[in-house]
């Protein structure tokens, strides 16, 4: 059994900046209430450019609520969400601002079949995003579609297929390509490999690692699986307790030890 680490200093409130001096994402004092229920309370973290963070917890721990607030599907009761220097925690009615927010943060859900239009091929799905966010002419869009299809490891036949003709792993690759078409700084992966079998899961995780190296996108991984966290992320926070640890080591700890961390406690691993 691994040696129990001793607590380190309090959790830092200011994330490390990216290469350009601005963090890809900063979350400060985030709180979400649903009536009398407090789903998320005083969450703060940050991700540098090309960094990755896992939000770990069991069902009902608030991890998906955090993700939904970051992407803009829920409004926080209190707190600030900054992406690329822009405040996402405030509502906006400007179509231009909404498109900019879409270029800053994208999300890939657990079940791609329910998030893909069953009437659209992979090519058409990606083309729709390119037209919305970039407004490029058709020839440039076709070239970018081909690049993205190749990046996620699909072939020309699969690119022309409808979602029902693709496997679960192939549909997830389409969903990843669609998200990347907006050229986001941050990509949220909400249990995105949980429904895949182990071999396909490993392929998608390896793909995501390669994409991060190539595009410098930052990842937020929502997961209950510490093995997945260990493979893809640099650090992790426990959603209900807000405990921070290096993910490469935390997968070696007993799960009850990880959940028992005090709020704000930081663990240092050798």
Residue ranges: model-predicted function:
Residues 56-58:
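The feature captures the beta-strand-to-loop junction immediately N-terminal to the Walker
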Residues 71:
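Helix-to-loop junction immediately C-terminal to a conserved catalytic motif
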Residues 79-90:
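Conserved ABC transporter NBD signature motif
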Residues 88-106, 124, 132, 138-139:
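ABC ATPase NBD coupling module
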Residues 140-157, 210:
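Conserved ABC ATPase "signature" region
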Residues 162-166, 170:
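Conserved ABC ATPase signature
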Residues 183:
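Conserved catalytic motifs of ABC-family nucleotide-binding domains
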């Amino acid at each position: 059994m691994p040696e129990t680490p001793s607590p380190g200093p309090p959790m830092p409130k200011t994330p490390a900046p990216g290469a350009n001096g601005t963090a890809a994402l900063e979350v400060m004092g985030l709180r979400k209430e649903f009536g009398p229920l407090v789903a998320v309370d005083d969450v703060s973290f940050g991700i540098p450019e090309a960094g990755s963070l896992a939000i770990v917890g069991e069902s009902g721990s608030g991890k998906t609520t955090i993700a939904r607030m970051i992407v803009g599907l829920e409004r926080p009761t209190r707190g600030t969400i900054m992406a690329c220097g822009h405040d996402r925690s405030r509502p906006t009615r400007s179509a231009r601002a909404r498109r900019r927010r879409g270029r800053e943060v994208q999300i890939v859900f657990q079940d791609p079949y329910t998030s893909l239009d069953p009437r659209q091929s992979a090519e058409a799905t990606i083309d729709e995003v390119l037209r919305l966010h970039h407004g490029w002419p058709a020839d440039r869009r076709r070239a970018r579609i081909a690049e993205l299809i190749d990046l996620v490891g699909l072939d020309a036949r699969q690119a022309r297929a409808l979602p029902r003709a693709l496997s679960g792993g192939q549909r997830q690759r389409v969903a990843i390509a669609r998200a990347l078409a907006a050229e986001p700084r941050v990509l949220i992966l909400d249990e995105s490999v949980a429904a895949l079998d182990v071999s396909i899961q490993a392929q998608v995780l390896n793909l995501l690692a390669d994409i991060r190296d190539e595009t410098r996108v930052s990842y937020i991984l929502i997961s209950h699986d510490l093995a997945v966290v260990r493979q893809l992320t640099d650090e992790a926070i426990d959603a209900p307790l807000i405990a921070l640890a290096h993910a490469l080591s935390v997968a070696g700890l007993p799960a009850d030890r990880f959940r028992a961390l005090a709020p704000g406690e930081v663990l240092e691993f050798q």
